[in-house]
């Protein structure tokens, strides 16, 4: 829908201040040229070398052969494949083929790069290298990158903002750290709350989610709380994350059954540099 190859049944699509549904055919074609796209499958032409694959969209646009090859070699340098210009796709690894696809998508100097599940077919090590490349492209070339993924780790690694979609509708929008710290929608909570056998948790118990960020992620907040408040708690789940280069951690605690002890624990957490809230629905998320 962002490229308007698929027209939405309702609503509008606005890209760079232009409402695509109101553009003429010629204007829409020009708008699409400002968008590059990579997919889960690399879709390289098998009978063309890496260099020739990158030149292909430039040839279609009427760019001279010399200028197209010059641009393609510049892009091969950017994606770290300057020594693979004459290799065919069958001679490249999956990660290298995706790098060629990225270079091809950048050939026309787009303002926006759309990444549709671009790392889903790659192993974890290659995924990290591709994400690092995309992050560098965003930083050095100033291109807006829109990532479509079901992997929260990808969002945490390279994105500044996130829109969570549930049943074809946007359930929540915000910066990645805002959504991680204070998820509001049920879908966001499913994605962000620590994994675990939630069904094994007793219903009717009180649970608290604590989020640590920055330096506070390294402080012994829970142990200090137990000592200070004399309120023992059970740590049900915990994990840590790196979101856009910043350390975050979260815990799900089972609060004491004694009401006064539970209130002391929550009051103490409010005085610390952490976000804490009761999550009565945690066991059922």
Can you describe what each PLM-predicted range is?
Residues 88-92, 96-98:
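Conserved ABC ATPase signature
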Residues 48-56:
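Short coil-to-helix segment of the ABC ATPase nucleotide-binding domain corresponding to the Q-loop/switch region
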Residues 18-19, 55, 59-83:
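Conserved ABC ATPase "signature" region
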Residues 20-36, 65-69, 179-183:
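ABC ATPase NBD coupling module
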Residues 87-90, 108, 115:
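Conserved signature/switch motifs of ABC ATPase nucleotide-binding domains
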Residues 173-174, 182:
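ABC ATPase "signature
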Residues 3:
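Helix-to-loop junction immediately C-terminal to a conserved catalytic motif
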């Amino acid at each position: 829908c962002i490229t308007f190859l698929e027209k939405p049944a309702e609503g509008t699509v606005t890209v760079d201040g232009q409402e695509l549904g109101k553009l003429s055919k010629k204007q829409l074609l020009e708008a699409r040229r400002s968008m590059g796209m990579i997919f889960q499958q690399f879709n390289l032409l098998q009978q063309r070398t890496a260099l020739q694959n990158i030149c292909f969209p430039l040839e279609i646009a009427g760019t001279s052969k010399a200028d197209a090859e010059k641009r393609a070699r510049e892009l091969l340098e950017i994606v770290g494949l300057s020594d693979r210009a004459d290799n065919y796709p069958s001679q490249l690894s999956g990660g290298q083929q995706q790098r060629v696809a990225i270079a091809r998508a950048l050939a026309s100097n787009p303002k926006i790069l759309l990444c549709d599940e671009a790392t889903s077919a790659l192993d974890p090590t290659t995924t990290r290298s591709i994400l690092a490349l995309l992050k560098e492209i965003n930083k050095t070339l100033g291109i807006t990158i829109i990532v479509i993924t079901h992997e929260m780790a990808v969002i945490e690694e390279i994105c500044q903002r996130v829109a969570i979609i549930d049943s074809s509708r946007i359930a929540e929008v915000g910066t990645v750290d805002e959504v991680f710290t204070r998820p509001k929608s049920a879908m966001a909570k499913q994605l962000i709350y620590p994994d675990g056998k939630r069904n094994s948790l007793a219903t009717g118990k009180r649970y608290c989610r604590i989020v640590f960020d920055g330096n506070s992620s390294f402080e012994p907040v829970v142990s200090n709380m137990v000592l200070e408040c004399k309120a023992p708690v059970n740590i049900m789940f915990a994990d840590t994350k790196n979101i856009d280069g910043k350390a975050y951690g979260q815990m799900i605690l089972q609060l004491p059954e004694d009401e006064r002890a539970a209130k002391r624990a929550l009051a103490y957490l409010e005085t610390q540099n952490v976000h804490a809230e009761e999550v009565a629905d945690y066991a059922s998320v």
